[in-house]
Amino acid sequence: MPTLSIIIPVYNSEKYLKQCLDSILAQAFDDFEILLIDDGSTDFSGKLCDEYASRYNNIYVFHEKNRGVSAARNKGIERVQGEYVIFVDSDDWLEKNALSFLMAQESDVDLIFYGSSFHSVNGNVTLYSPNLCICHGFSEVQEGMIDLITNPKYYDYLGFTWNKVFRSNILKEYNIRFIENLSYREDEVFTLHYAHYCKKLMILPNIVYNYRVSDTGLTKKKHTYDEFLLLSHAYQESLIYYTDKRLQEYMILQIIRNYLNAIKRISNIRKRNTIIKELWVFYQEKNIFDMSLKIKSVYRHLLCLPSAWFMNIYMSIKLLFK
């Protein structure tokens, strides 16, 4: 069995896939398997995957119908044989000796965060090198995570899976998977679910991963109210596991924001009122008005909304709960 499994979802990435795979195959550490999940590519990507698999006996290809990156990653998780798991996007690449560095870390660590560099389409490179932190026990794990996301530069560091090392036994034992019909912040939800079972976390400043900010990545996808509602519910499921107040407040803010985003996109009055009721019950259950929560950011969110829409929400709450 290999020490490391590398899961790579592939979709129409023929332009960069070779660089991605070559950066892995050139590593000094070679006790790994590569799982290429071809997510219904319509270009040459699928054939390129097959070519590499025919040349290297540690590369496995799975051709799937197009179901999205989360489904592709889940397929990979089901097939992993390694003790550790990393995710790599098919248009990105690893630094030289990245795997040797990661696999040389302490063997009892459950989750590793590492540094990365962002490469923009105009050639600019931004380095993300978080402070070194070794956290023992779930309380310290929570502290390490909140220290990252309260840092303005690293607030979105939970929102990626390609900057982390996971243990396959935790993924399998607790059936941790990506939510397949969620295409917004699904990586963060996955990480929060996983981290609950971690007893040791390492945050490393070393640059290991190169992330390509593509043209398509710069285009904002329009999300439906169903997605925002699903995301709000997913955060609520994670919330029950965490005891750190700052981390709880962070998740509560995400829950409220996503409820508001869902409500804003619902045209059906009855359905909208149902969600407003759900949000109001959440407010009351969590005693949000009595918390030292950074609720001001939610108020700022509300104040940025069109005044007519804000008044509509306000009047709906008054009518529903009078």
Give residue spans per PLM region.
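A conserved acidic beta->alpha catalytic loop
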Residues: 23, 38-48, 65, 89
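Donor-binding/catalytic cores of nucleotide-activated saccharide
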Residues: 69, 90-201, 209-226
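Short aromatic/hydrophobic "clamp" motif used to bind/position activated sugar donors
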Residues: 85
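Membrane-interface aromatic/basic loop that binds lipid-linked glycans or pyrophosphate carriers
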Residues: 267-322
